[in-house]
């Protein structure tokens, strides 16, 4: 069976076409895994201005619909048997989301789903655990997106991953870049404002997710993978090198400061930096480093590193169709 999955977030829209492959272990137990056929991303900034206006901008809708048309063609060419389209933070917050949903349905011929933060967290967790291996009940996955960040505590692997508790908060690289007019280089005052918003968000997470019990941290999404590329000193973006890499708290903090201190032009010249992330990476890495710093404090030093996963909600969307 060939599965199609589309994740439409605040900053990007991504497509995964994968084959469901059944494998049998030495004990005769069958498991189903995904084998990638196509994996693509377009930066469309759907959430442009949503934090301030509460509406999806027409130019943002146009960019997203254009990418959706490309994906519709790829799904047709590769013969996907099932397709699921999931929209997250920006669409949840938008007063004109029906315009978006009607447009997507017309282009793709399927009904898009605007999922809750809770379901977003669950799908992110399932996708991340596919890549980092079976963990214990104290694995914390955080998915730092454009408009929101999901914190998920749980254990298990792939489709069997189980969420113990989760919380979605409205802190993301696009949202805070716009809210605090984050520049390049990022000023000390802007860092303080972004960190203050992040701290406030984490306080709301603690009320529903026992972060102090976490023994392992896993980070997913573009901010985390881009920082990993920088920390590894990659000349170009390399998914295989990034996936599963472990970074110390000190490395994350140091690399975040390096990226914050760069001008827009310096960031744009980095071989691993997607053009659509140049303007939002400063706020993104500030949020990322602050989350890991607070996790280190909350767990009394137990969490002092983070594992980076290339697999996230997009894989979770695909796994949900098995």
What are these model-predicted stretches?
Residues 1-33, 128, 134-166, 220-228:
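Gly/Thr-rich phosphate-binding beta-strand-loop-beta motif of the actin/hexokinase/Hsp70
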Residues 1-21, 38, 43, 49-53, ...:
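Short, charged N-terminal helix-start/capping segments
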Residues 11-59, 157-190:
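Short glycine-rich, Thr/Ser-proximal phosphate-binding strand/loop in the N-terminal lobe
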Residues 49-77, 90-138, 165-322:
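Helical "lid/coupling" subdomains associated with nucleotide-phosphate turnover
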Residues 83:
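Surface-exposed, interaction-prone regions with an acidic/low-complexity signature
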């Amino acid at each position: 069976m060939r599965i199609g999955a589309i994740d439409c977030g605040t900053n990007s829209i991504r497509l995964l076409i994968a084959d469901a492959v059944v494998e049998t272990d030495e004990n005769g137990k069958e498991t189903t895994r995904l084998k990638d056929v196509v994996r693509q991303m377009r930066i469309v900034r759907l959430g442009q201005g949503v934090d301030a206006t509460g509406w999806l901008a027409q130019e943002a809708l146009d960019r997203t619909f254009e990418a959706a048309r490309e994906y519709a063609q790829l799904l047709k060419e590769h013969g996907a048997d099932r397709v699921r389209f999931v929209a997250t933070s920006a669409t949840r917050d938008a007063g004109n989301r029906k315009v978006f949903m009607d447009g997507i349905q017309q282009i793709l011929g399927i009904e898009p789903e605007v999922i809750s933060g809770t379901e977003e967290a669950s799908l992110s967790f399932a996708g991340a655990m596919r890549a980092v291996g079976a963990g214990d009940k104290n694995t914390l996955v955080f998915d730092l997106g454009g408009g929101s960040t999901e914190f998920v505590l749980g254990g298990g692997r792939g489709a069997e991953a189980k969420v113990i508790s989760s919380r979605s908060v409205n802190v993301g690289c696009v949202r805070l870049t716009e809210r605090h007019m984050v520049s390049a280089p990022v000023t000390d005052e802007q860092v303080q404002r972004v960190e203050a918003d992040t701290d406030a968000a984490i306080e709301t997470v603690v009320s529903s997710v026992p972060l102090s019990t976490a023994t392992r941290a896993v980070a997913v999404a573009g901010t985390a993978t881009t920082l990993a590329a920088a920390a590894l000193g990659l000349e170009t973006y390399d998914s295989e090198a990034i996936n599963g890499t472990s970074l110390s708290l000190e490395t994350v903090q140091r690399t975040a400061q390096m990226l914050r201190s760069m001008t827009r032009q310096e960031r744009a010249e980095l071989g691993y930096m997607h053009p659509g992330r140049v303007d939002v990476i400063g706020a993104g890495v500030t949020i990322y480093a602050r989350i890991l710093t607070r996790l280190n404090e909350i767990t009394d030093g137990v969490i002092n590193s983070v594992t980076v996963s290339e697999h996230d909600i997009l894989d979770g969307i695909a796994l949900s169709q098995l």
